[in-house]
């Protein structure tokens, strides 16, 4: 095993849930302001997951006061306190850039229903 691969394996986070493009998530990010630290929650739809290993990132989009806001987070960042999956989205694409042009009900993502055991 390569030395860099060993370092990557040590730094990778295992406490995060499994999520993908189309899911609505709440990202609890730690923000440092001066000498104080607080947790800021950013809730939105995952537009993409990009990269692999330690350098993997994901893009979250939400509409705030009628303006689209997008934030990119590194998956393995220590600044992320935790990630909550609010709903699972049923989409057929890995990158949902087309949501940027859609407004209102057209921008709504179908919710994935889990099959109940019978």
Swiss-Prot record:
Task: Name the InterPro entries for this protein.
Answer: Ribosomal_bL19, Ribosomal_bL19_CS, Ribosomal_bL19_sf, Translation_prot_SH3-like_sf
Which family does the similarity line name?
Answer: Belongs to the bacterial ribosomal protein bL19 family.
Q: Name the SUPFAM superfamilies for this protein.
A: Translation proteins SH3-like domain
Q: Any idea what job this protein has?
A: This protein is located at the 30S-50S ribosomal subunit interface and may play a role in the structure and function of the aminoacyl-tRNA binding site.
One Pfam family this sequence matches: Ribosomal_L19
Q: What is this protein called?
A: Large ribosomal subunit protein bL19
Q: Which domain of life does the UniProt lineage start with?
A: Bacteria
Q: Which Gene Ontology terms describe the biological processes this protein takes part in? A: translation
Keywords, comma-separated and alphabetical: Ribonucleoprotein, Ribosomal protein
A single Gene Ontology MF term assigned here is: structural constituent of ribosome
Name the GO cellular-component terms.
Answer: cytosolic large ribosomal subunit
Q: Which gene codes for it?
A: rplS
């Amino acid at each position: 095993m390569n030395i860099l691969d060993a370092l990557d394996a040590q730094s990778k986070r295992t406490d995060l849930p499994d999520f993908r493009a189309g899911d609505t998530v709440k990202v609890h990010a730690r923000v440092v302001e001066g000498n104080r630290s607080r947790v800021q929650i950013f809730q939105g739809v995952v537009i993409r997951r990009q990269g692999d290993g330690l350098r993997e990132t994901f893009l979250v989009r939400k509409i705030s006061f009628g303006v689209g806001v997008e934030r990119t987070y590194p998956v393995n960042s220590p600044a992320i306190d935790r990630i909550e999956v609010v709903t699972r989205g049923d989409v057929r694409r890995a990158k949902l850039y087309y949501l940027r042009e859609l407004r209102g009900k057209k921008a709504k993502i179908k919710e994935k229903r889990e099959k109940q055991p019978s």
